[in-house]
């Protein structure tokens, strides 16, 4: 028997594409249970009342239901026996009775991805240099400008309001449901965030390791001078999600 000693070429997967490597890198935002300080039953009751006068409108127009920011922040403050602290440029909206900081967001899920939530916007210091860095294709420097500003903003909020753990609490609307999901914010992990390059038309910069790419996407936008979070549809299948309301 003649043996073929020619070995098959081994396919090497680049390290940055290997899921086992990516998954071990701690993210700045990670899914977690709704904090125990928040009374979920209270939130459900408030959403039910809110929707009573609106449900028929959403059914007839085919639009997704939407929770207005002013209501959601007020509800979370009441449900946590806390208070609203987010007026102005504060990095959090609510301080719970357990001294947790909650940044509340309300988004609509459309075609697999939500509309945006602004994490950081700057038209002055960092914003002035952003156009130049985009023109020079310096994505790392541009992203660093905004992540450093974000760290400063959050840590200042945490210190001034004596906050412990920090969270982003999201109301997510689909055609039929309103959900609530929580992301824990680990601000000290922001150094893990990397640029994954510009989009084709150089309008924004994609990021890695800010959030698991299966559940969300965070980009820096040139025109808006803003770091934005969008959630992906996969997030509504997470075990920590709470269904607040269903349109019958």
Residues covered by each model-derived region:
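Nucleic-acid endonuclease domains
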Residues: 2-90, 96-97, 106-248
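Redox-cofactor binding/interface segments in oxidoreductases and associated redox assembly factors
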Residues: 103
């Amino acid at each position: 028997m003649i043996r073929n000693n020619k070995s098959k070429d081994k396919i090497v997967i680049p390290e940055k594409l290997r899921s086992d490597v990516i998954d071990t890198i701690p993210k700045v935002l990670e899914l977690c249970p709704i904090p125990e300080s928040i009374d979920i039953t209270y939130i459900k009751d408030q959403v039910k009342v809110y929707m009573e006068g609106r449900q028929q409108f959403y059914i007839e127009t085919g639009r997704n239901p939407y929770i207005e920011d002013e209501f959601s922040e007020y509800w979370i403050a009441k449900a946590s026996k806390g208070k609203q602290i987010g007026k102005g440029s504060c990095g959090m909206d609510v301080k719970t009775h357990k001294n947790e900081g909650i940044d509340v967001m309300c988004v609509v899920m459309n075609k697999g991805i939500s509309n945006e939530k602004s994490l950081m916007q700057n038209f002055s210091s960092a914003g002035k240099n952003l156009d130049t860095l985009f023109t020079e294709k310096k994505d790392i420097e541009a992203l660093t400008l905004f992540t450093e500003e974000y760290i400063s903003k959050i840590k200042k909020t945490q210190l001034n309001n004596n906050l412990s753990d920090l969270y982003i609490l999201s109301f997510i609307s689909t055609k039929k449901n309103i959900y609530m999901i929580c992301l824990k914010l680990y601000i000290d992990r922001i150094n893990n965030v990397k640029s994954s390059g510009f989009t084709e038309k150089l309008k924004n910069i994609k990021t890695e390791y800010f959030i698991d790419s299966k559940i969300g996407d965070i980009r820096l936008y040139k025109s808006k001078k803003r770091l934005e979070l969008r959630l992906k549809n996969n997030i509504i299948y997470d075990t920590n999600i709470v269904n607040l309301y269903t349109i019958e």
